Amino acid sequence: MRDVQIDLGEVPSGESGTALPRAPVPYRWILGPLTLLLVVMLGGGGPPPQPPPAPFVLPLTLGDGIRLDENRLYVVEQADPVGTVVRHHTIRAYDLPGMELLDTYRVEVTGDIQRIADVGDGLLMVGFSDVQNGDPGTSVMRPDDETPVWTRPVDLYGIAPDRSVLLAYEGPGANQPVWRGMDPRTGAVLWSMEPSEVLQVTMPVESFWSGFPERIYALRADGRLEVRSARTGVVTATTRPAGPLRDDTAIWAAGGLVLVGRGTEETTAYDQETLAEKWRRPGPVMPEDGFPQDCRPTICIATYGGGGFSAVDPATGRLLWRADGYDAGEVIDGHVVVSQSSQAEPALALLDPRSGTVVTRIPGWVSGGPGPAPGTAWVYRLNQPGYQLAYGVLDLGDGKVRLLGRAERIAGGCQFNTAVLVCRRLDSSIAVWRL
């Protein structure tokens, strides 16, 4: 503060020069308001906001891969030797968000590692595909022990949150697999559903993100529709849809309903728990290349290949709205979040699930999935050239982004979970930020 004089008064003659008199009485009244004004101007007088902590940087090579779940980060080192059929993989498991090394696993498989899941008690489930024929396989490993606890030629679909049962499937083909419920610690088969019994199988769409369905819906060869417990394999409800089975008969499960479509002729909806019929209407409800999503109070349908988004009324099956021009989308806490990621400048938009109208647009940002609190989403933007990253939290209610931090020299590959953000850097290392 330049050119400001403060009157300290005068020292009376004959008194010590160390004594400081009181401020002159006429000006004392202004000190209170002046102090208040300075506090307001300085933002409340508190300390300035602190920048986000520096990330934990883990050196990796370009051939190393990473897998992220809710509380673990797995680093899959490049297989040794490269290009052979039998490959030796080293997997390091880190605790999140502290990045403490927990265990190291050594896996010998005939191919590449596709999936990793924590089974509990230090056991790690590893899913792989055979490099020669593409057949799936799953092994459960102990730390620092290349001998599997068990191995089976199955592909992992999901594991229950309490780690008590896993859902897997195996040959003879991708269209007609054998579905199995298994004990993840021992590999014992708890129940099976053979392809000779069923024509089609589907699960509620929510399980694609949660990782495990509580119910499985099957259209049997004899024309019956049934619901099974994914934990026990027990059939809990059954019904026989009207009309004969056809080659184009298909089933889906979303929004509390199981939909049975008979080509372009008819669609019937059933309750997901009881299979009681809810409604029936002529024509298709689900397009051939559609994917249902639960965005209650409606059922949203994403069309593959950038075909846009639409929504139907779960009470009647009537088409409510359609929004074109979006190539990706997701439903977070009932909010429809769509994106235009194929454009030079990515953009997000929030749609009203009842009408499909655009509530707000968020240019330049990419969704990172459900955020730290209900009604929020993680978002980030990566500027190239420049390799500059910004990340934050999107409020799905008002469309505003709260910036959390920035970073330089980021190549991409960013992933969020509830605790961290992980991104690849230009030197192939990964940076891990606490959120």
Per-region residue spans from a language model:
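Secretory-pathway ectodomains
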Residues: 1-435
